[in-house]
Amino acid sequence: MAKTKKNIGKKILLGIFIAAVAIAVIATVVNFGVYKSLLKKGSEYNKVEIENQLVPEKDENDNWYFTTDGDLKVMHLTDIHIGGGWMSYGKDLKTLNAVATMVTREKPDLVVATGDIAYPVFFQAGTFNNYSGAKIFANLMETLGVYWTVTFGNHDAEAYSYFDREAVAKIYSDEDFKHAMNFVAYAAK
């Protein structure tokens, strides 16, 4: 009888383990689909047409600057909180739309996003993946065609997130992002 109880206990533990693995696999597949869908959505917006758009230049020390005798219009965004997971999908769509609408209407020369672009908080986003939120935001900004830069906030590289600051910095300093004005020390390592 003791052996039977032991076998039942092992079977229960095995069942729990298999269920946990199945849930993890399903969540991974669903979150990847959400990520691809949000990237696609971010690519569907129209490029912002800015009359007499200022074009930044770099000095001999690789510092960005604008030259103008007129106004420099800067838009400041913060706490964008793109979760990039199945639990935040609806909110993320609204966030992309809000950012695109503000940038399109205001037509800034530069957008400065000061932290918390990603929000990989599992119980709200359904993922710990902070890469997704960063990549989705960068993709949106490039689609809009405005110059942009970022700083990190506490949620962009949480201790429990999949990717560290260096990995996220590499996203923002990708050479394919022609409008990104990011000097990121982490990317040089």
Identify what each model region corresponds to.
Residues N31-Y131, I136:
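N-terminal active-site segment of His-dependent metallophosphoesterases
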Residues K41-I50, V55-D62, S132-K189:
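Extended active-site neighborhood of metal-dependent phosphoesterases/phosphodiesterases
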Residues A2-A22:
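N-terminal Sec-pathway targeting helices
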Residues K3-K6, N129, Y160:
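Intrinsic low-complexity, intrinsically disordered segments enriched in polar/basic residues
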Residues A20-G33:
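Hydrophobic alpha-helical membrane-insertion segments, chiefly the h-region
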